[in-house]
Amino acid sequence: MIIRSPEPEVKILVDRDPIKTSFEEWAKPGHFSRTIAKGPDTTTWIWNLHADAHDFDSHTSDLEEISRKVFSAHFGQLSIIFLWLSGMYFHGARFSNYEAWLSDPTHIGPSAQVVWPIVGQEILNGDVGGGFRGIQITSGFFQIWRASGITSELQLYCTAIGALVFAALMLFAGWFHYHKAAPKLAWFQDVESMLNHHLAGLLGLGSLSWAGHQVHVSLPINQFLNAGVDPKEIPLPHEFILNRDLLAQLYPSFAEGATPFFTLNWSKYSEFLTFRGGLDPVTGGLWLTDIAHHHLAIAILFLIAGHMYRTNWGIGHGLKDILEAHKGPFTGQGHKGLYEILTTSWHAQLSLNLAMLGSLTIVVAHHMYSMPPYPYLATDYATQLSLFTHHMWIGGFLIVGAAAHAAIFMVRDYDPTNRYNDLLDRVLRHRDAIISHLNWACIFLGFHSFGLYIHNDTMSALGRPQDMFSDTAIQLQPVFAQWIQKTHALAPGVTAPGETASTSLTWGGGELVAVGGKVALLPIPLGTADFLVHHIHAFTIHVTVLILLKGVLFARSSRLIPDKASLGFRFPCDGPGRGGTCQVSAWDHVFLGLFWMYNAISVVIFHFSWKMQSDVWGSISDQGVVTHITGGNFAQSSITINGWLRDFLWAQASQVIQSYGSSLSAYGLFFLGAHFVWAFSLMFLFSGRGYWQELIESIVWAHNKLKVAPATQPRALSIVQGRAVGVTHYLLGGIATTWAFFLARIIAVG
C-alpha cells in the first residue's frame, strides 16, 4: 500500500466578474459617498468631491475592495506613463533635430519642439546649431536615446507607437483586474510571492534584458558612432542580434559564443564587460561597457535575491519569521506585529516605500553629475542642472509623502490595543525625548550655521576680511569630506585593484575630461564655503524631519489633545471653546513640512548651480587652461549672505530679467508669472476664513439685488482647504520661478 502525501490544494486567487462594468456612475459625481452623491448645496461640495475621490478608505472599509481599487489605479497610472513616454518619443521623431545632434553632439543643442507662428511667438525658436531653430530641451532624452543605440527618427517613431500599444494594454489590464478577474485579499498579502516576482522578475530579469540589449545593440552602435561613422551607414539593431559575425568584428570573443561562459573562462568577455571606472574621453559619459557589466551584476544579485523567500515549495525565508526574530537586548518585542501592520495597512507600506524611493531619487540626483551615465550628458550643462534640480524636488516631495502616509497609518490603521513593547510602541512611548532632542539639534544647527554667515557679513561690512571664516583667513576646512574624497581617489589599484580610474572624477586625482573644448568633469575642491553651506543643509533637513516626525509621533494623541485620533487625519482646531488648538492635525504637519522641504531643496540646488558654474563647468583652451563660467567665485563670495544675494541671485538673474526680445523670453514671462503665482499663495496663507465669508456675503447680496444669485450657495474655503490651495501655489510658484531663473541663465552662458 502506497501512502501519498496529500496534494497541496490549488488556491483560487481571483474572483470572476465581481463588479459589473457600467458607465452610469460616470454621470453621478460623488457616487462613492452618500453625502457627496446628493449633489451640491454649497460650493464646498466641489472641494469635498476632489478631496475624497481617491481616498478609497473613505469609500469602503473592506480591505479587499480598497486593495483592488489601488491595484487597478496603478494600471491607469502606468497607462498615463506610457502615454507620456510615447509623446516624448513622438516629439523626438516628428519635431526634433535628433539625427543632426547625433552627427555633432558637441556643437548642436538638442531640440524637440518647434513653436508655430501665431502671434509672433516663433521668436522662441532659437538657433540650436546645425541650421535648426527650435526650443532647446533639457530632459536628457537625446543622450539616453544615443546610449540605447537609437540612430534614426524612424526608430523613435516605431518606439512611440509601441508605447501607445502598451498604454492601451495597461488600460485594459486595469479594467480586467477590477471588473473581470479581481485578485482576492490573500493574493495582495502574499508577500513572499510578491518579493519573488518583483526582485527576480522586475529587477532581475529587467536588468538582465537591459544588459543584453546593451551588449548586443547599444555597445556596437555606440562604438561606430564614437568612431565617427555616419548613423545611416551603421547596421540596424536586428542585424547585430541575428548576425554574430558582425559583433565578432568589434568584439572578437563573440565568435566563441557561450563556450567561455560554460567553461568558466569568463575573462574572455572582458572586452565588452569592463571594470574601468572614470569617464570615456570621447563622450564624457561613463564607459558603456562598465554600465553593461554593472547591469549584468545587478541582474545576478536580484535573481538570487528573488529566490530566497518561501513560496509554493516550502523552502526559503518567511518574512513573518524574519521580522519576529528581529529582537535585540534593548528593543523589547522588536518587530513583532510589524508583518501584520504591513500586510493590512497600505498606508504603512506606502510610507516605507516613499521614504526609500525619495532617498534613492536624491541619490540619483547626485550621481547624474558625478558619474554622468549617458554620452555627451556631462557637457550639456542645461540638462545637467535640470536633471539635478528635478530629482532633488521629486525626492523631497516623496519624503514628505512618506511622512503623510505614516501619519495616516497612525490615525486610521494603527491599533494600540494589540501593540505592546514592540519597536513602534517603544518609539511612541519616548517620543517626547526624541522630539525635544531633535528640537535642540535644530536650534543648535540653526544658530551656529547661520551665525557663521552673520559673522562673515559683519566682518565684511566692517572691512575686516582677515577676521572672516574663509579659505584665506580663518579656515574651516571640511576635513572629513576631504578625507573621503582622498580615500576614493586613491582606491584604483589599491583597495579596488581591478579598476583603472576612480568611480568619479569628482574625488580628485588631477585628471580632467573635456569634450569639444567644454569641461565634462574634473576634481571638485571642497573648502570653507562648502563647510558653511553644508551646515545650512544639515539645519534645513533636521527642521523638515522635526516637523514631519512630530506629526507622525503625535498623530493619535498629545498632551494638548489626548483624543486626537478621534478627530481624524485633518481638522482645523479642536472644536469651539478650546483656543490654541489649531494647526495640530497630522495634515497640518505635512502642510508645514512642505515649506521646510522647499527651503531645504532650494538651498541644495542653489549650492549645486553656483558651485558647478564656479568650479567645474567652463571651457578649456588648446593650452589646457580652464576658464570657469563664473571664474571660481564661489569660495570667496558664498561665505556671506550678501554674497549669495549679490553674486548668485542678482548677478545670475540678469539673463532671465533681460530675456525679453530673445529666444529665451518665455523664461522671462515664466519668471514673472511664477512670482505672481507664488505671491497669490500668500493671500490664502495670511488671511482667515471669516474674512472671505464676510466678503462673499456682500457679493451674494449684490447678486440677489440683481436677481442673478446661483442656486448653489457660495461658501468660503474651509481652513484646511485654504491652506492646501496656499501651499500648492507657494510650491508651484517657487519651483517655476527657480526653473525659469536656472534655465535662462544656463542656456545663455552654458
Swiss-Prot record:
Species name: Aethionema grandiflorum
HAMAP family: PSI_PsaA (MF_00458)
Taxonomic classification: Eukaryota, Viridiplantae, Streptophyta, Embryophyta, Tracheophyta
Subunit and interaction comment: The PsaA/B heterodimer binds the P700 chlorophyll special pair and subsequent electron acceptors. PSI consists of a core antenna complex that captures photons, and an electron transfer chain that converts photonic excitation into a charge separation. The eukaryotic PSI reaction center is composed of at least 11 subunits.
Pfam family, one: PsaA_PsaB
Protein EC: 1.97.1.12
Catalysed reactions listed for this entry: reduced [plastocyanin] + hnu + oxidized [2Fe-2S]-[ferredoxin] = oxidized [plastocyanin] + reduced [2Fe-2S]-[ferredoxin]
Annotated residues for binding of chlorophyll a: 683, 691
PROSITE patterns, per the entry: PHOTOSYSTEM_I_PSAAB
UniProt binding sites for chlorophyll a': 675
Any one of the GO CC terms: chloroplast thylakoid membrane
Protein name: Photosystem I P700 chlorophyll a apoprotein A1
Signal sequence extent: none
Cellular localisation: Plastid, Chloroplast thylakoid membrane
Function comment: PsaA and PsaB bind P700, the primary electron donor of photosystem I (PSI), as well as the electron acceptors A0, A1 and FX. PSI is a plastocyanin-ferredoxin oxidoreductase, converting photonic excitation into a charge separation, which transfers an electron from the donor P700 chlorophyll pair to the spectroscopically characterized acceptors A0, A1, FX, FA and FB in turn. Oxidized P700 is reduced on the lumenal side of the thylakoid membrane by plastocyanin.
Transmembrane segments: 70-93, 156-179, 195-219, 291-309, 346-369, 385-411, 433-455, 531-549, 589-610, 664-686, 724-744
Cofactor: how bound: P700 is a chlorophyll a/chlorophyll a' dimer, A0 is one or more chlorophyll a, A1 is one or both phylloquinones and FX is a shared 4Fe-4S iron-sulfur center.
Disulfide bonds: none
Gene that specifies this protein: psaA
